[in-house]
Regions:
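Short N-terminal signal/transit or membrane-insertion segments
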Residues: 2-3, 65-73, 174-180
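Generic N-terminal amphipathic, Lys/Arg-enriched alpha-helix
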Residues: 2-27
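Divalent metal-dependent catalytic cores for phosphoryl transfer on phosphate-bearing substrates
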Residues: 17-25, 42-160, 203-209
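A short, charge-rich alpha-helical start-of-domain segment used by transcription regulators
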Residues: 28-33
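Solvent-exposed, charged/polar functional surfaces in cytosolic regulatory/catalytic domains
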Residues: 40-43, 169
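Amphipathic, Lys/Arg-enriched alpha-helical patches that create a basic surface
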Residues: 157-158, 162-170
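Charged phosphate-binding loop/patch that engages nucleotide di/tri-phosphates or the phosphate backbone
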Residues: 169-212
């Protein structure tokens, strides 16, 4: 069932049918994660004065394509780069948007947040920021409590920390960073023209919840 949302007064708050679709599309453990992301995204949005109903909706829908086979992800979201082709899981945000649009979901703010949660917000959509931060820091992951706490008082700083940490972590291990993530990274105010960030932290990667 949908996690309690006592303060929402918005058409998007009526999500029972979509909640059931998500529950049927993902594994039980993933569904629990989805509900935690939706709840945290809603709380972050409320604290920042952002549309919390849209944040909840995007959190609920963000992983609807996460458990699809690689062949289906590639069909729904044609690769944009070599990383997509080698690691189709990176496509599950774009694939989710495609599915939702086909099923009649039409809110562009929510759809963009769903699409961007795997690679990073493209800017100009605060709901995307809420969902991205909530996804990497929801309590069930067991990591990034500092990002979660920061998000409830300074979303912009939390988003910067999450993206910088992810890029630093991947680059430190010689792993190629997705072009969309790099665009989000270089758009951050804290990133210099040479791509460096003073004292950049690394984002811990939980063992039981592989990074998307």
């Amino acid at each position: 069932m949908i996690a309690e949302r006592p303060d929402l007064r918005h058409p998007l708050a009526d999500l029972a049918d979509w909640d059931e679709r998500v529950r049927l599309m993902v594994r039980p453990r993933r569904y629990d994660h989805v509900l935690r992301v939706a709840d945290l995204a809603c709380r972050i949005a409320r604290a920042a004065g952002i549309d919390e109903a849209r944040a909840y909706a995007a959190g609920l829908l963000h992983d609807i394509a996460r458990d699809l086979p690689d062949t289906e992800l590639l069909r729904l979201a044609p690769p944009e780069c070599a990383i997509d082709l080698a690691h189709p899981l990176a496509l599950h945000g774009r694939a989710a948007r495609t599915l939702l649009e086909r099923w009649g979901y039409a809110d562009p703010v929510v759809l963009e947040a769903v699409e961007d949660h795997t690679t990073g917000p493209r800017g100009g959509n605060p709901v995307s920021a809420c969902v991205y931060v909530a996804d990497v820091s929801e309590p069930g992951r067991g990591v990034n409590e500092d990002i979660r706490e920061l998000a409830l008082c300074d979303l912009e700083a939390a988003l910067s920390r999450a993206i910088v940490s992810k890029v630093t972590y991947l680059q430190g291990r010689g792993i190629r960073v997705h072009p969309r993530t790099l665009r989000s990274y270089h758009a951050l105010p804290c990133v210099g023209q040479d791509g460096s960030v003073p004292d950049a932290p690394r984002l811990p990667q939980p063992d039981r919840h592989p990074a998307p």
